[in-house]
Each structure stands twice: as structure tokens, then as C-alpha cells.
């Protein structure tokens, strides 16, 4: 799911570039087609190769524009709570997709349409379902955090990657 985060965050980053946008779109197409297959059948060599391809392409998609909100939120989750990086990034991806859906003069909805979704809200629903289908937790309640852990997350909530997100958080 981290591959999908890399691609989407590179696309909607304030520093997005046309070539990176095209790479992000290509990587997302592969992820939506093959991630669930790899999860359900890890021995599927074609699907694994395609996900490796998507990983490289998504890496290129965010290299110039940088990652944004989902990665910013993931770092304290991983550092303090030891949640695996990809799951921590994916935890907020569909939420930020919804927050960002109407920003950037419609380009976010157009991106989702290029992937076959009605709009970014529809794509956010698909991301949520994909996370569920591959066994990832989908909200912080599922981590049974203590009050102290929540306070720690709030205390270190501002990561520089948030400044790459097109909406002030």
C-alpha cells in the first residue's frame, strides 16, 4: 500500500511535475490491478513483478515532488507505536484523498477518472476497501491506543512533509 501512497502523494504534492504525474498514474493502475492478487497469491510471479515495477515507478513519481500527508502522519505511528511503515502510510491515505478531492482545480478528480473511478471520493472508497481486503487496519481505533500514546502522537504531529500537501492541515 506504500506504493500507492508514493504515487498519490507525488501526484497531489504542491511540487508535482507533469512527468511525475504520468508516472503516478501508471503506478496506481498497476497497484489497483495487482496488489490484491499478490496478497491472495504470493506465488503469482507476474503479479509480483508488476508490483515491483509499480514500486520503482511510484518511487520516481515522488522523487521530485516529495511525499505529503500520509507519510507525515506515518512517521510517529511507526516510530512510537512500531506500526509497519506501509500500513502506517496507508492508514490515512483514503482520508487524505477525500480531504484533497476538491482541491487543485479538479485535477485530483480527473486523476481518479483516468483510473476508472467516478471521482476521487469513489477512489477513496476503493482504497479503503483494498486496505480491508489485504488485512490492513483502517483507523486508529483498531490499535487500542492508550491516552498516553494518543498524547504522544498529538505532541509530534507536525512533520515537514505536511507542508507539501496542497491543503493546510
Would you name each region that the model predicts?
Residues 2, 18-29, 87, 102, ...:
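Alpha-helix N-cap/helix-start motif at coil-to-helix transitions, marked by capping-box chemistry
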Residues 108-169:
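C-terminal charged capping/lid subdomain of soluble metabolic enzymes
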Residues 23, 27, 47-50, 69, ...:
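Residue-level detector of well-ordered alpha-helical segments, enriched
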Residues 1-65, 166:
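Carboxylate- and glycine-rich phosphate/diphosphate-binding segment that chelates Mg2+/Mn2+
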Residues 65-120, 128:
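C-terminal catalytic subdomain
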Residues 7-15, 38, 58-61, 80, ...:
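Alpha-helix C-capping/helix-to-loop hinge sites
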Residues 4-8, 51-59, 73, 93, ...:
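Short alpha-helical scaffolding segments that buttress acidic/His motifs in well-ordered protein cores
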